[in-house]
Structures are given as C-alpha cells and as structure tokens.
Amino acid sequence: LPEEILQQIAEKSSGSYRDGFVFLEKILSQKELDEKTVTSLLAGVDFGTLVKFAAKLAEKDTKEAILLLNNLIAQGVSAQAINLEFIQFLRNLLFVKVGVFDNFGLTAENLTTLAKLSDDFDQSQILELLKLFESAIQAKNSPIAQLPTELAIAQFCLKD
C-alpha cells in the first residue's frame, strides 16, 4: 500500500490496533485504491474537498462554505471528523505558509496545492481558523451537530 494510505489508516485508528486492522481489511478488500475510495471507507474528507472548503473561507463565501459542510454531512461524514481533518489541513497550511515543508505525508502535488492556497491567507487568518475550528470540536453538546462548525464558518467569513 502507498505511504499516504498507511498514514490515513494510522491517523484514523488513533493508535488502536483493532481499529487500524479493521480499516486495513476494508481497504484491502477493494479492487481499486485511490484517494476517494480510501477516504470514503475511512469516513473522511478528501484533500480536494478540504482545498475547496478552505478556498471558500478565503473568499469569505459563507453560503458556499456552509453548503459544502452540509453536503459532507449528508454523505455521512460527521461534523467532528470534518473539524478534525480540517484542523490537520490548516496545520499543514500554516507550516507551508511559514516555509516548513517536511514530513506531512502529502504528495508533491498536494504540497504544491497547499503552497498556492497559502497565498490566499495571511498567518493570522490561518491561526484564527485553527482556533475557531478547535473551539467547534470542544462544543460537543450542541443540539445540532454541525452548528459549532457553521458558527466558526460564519464568524470567520463575516469578520472584516
């Protein structure tokens, strides 16, 4: 298996041998292995969707960012999983923005995409997004699962 897939399995299993083994079995049972297949099996968000989501935030497009979020949730991805993956994405984006390019487990193509996307944000905006989405993760008792994430989107996009 490619290194990227093994990295995704390790991240999703959070150190649990049993969970990692279950994810590995699911993936190995597939005839074709590509990023979309692996991501859907691991109930995650693919890199391209994270890029689109970040681009909508960079454009301060509240409506499209929330629609993209709700589309992911309709596909069965939990708000918590979206937040966790987006925080990791933002962390990588921040590192690229400040010139740290090593050992993200990303392809050269994805690193290039992050470098281009980093031009749409300044460091303080990336830090603000990290704080907002971290807060959304902490708000576990919301009556509407995606509400803290929607609020994070609106708060960032509606700020001058």
Predicted regions and their residues:
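Extended, largely alpha-helical regulatory/partner-binding modules appended to the mid-to-C-terminal parts
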Residues: 1-160
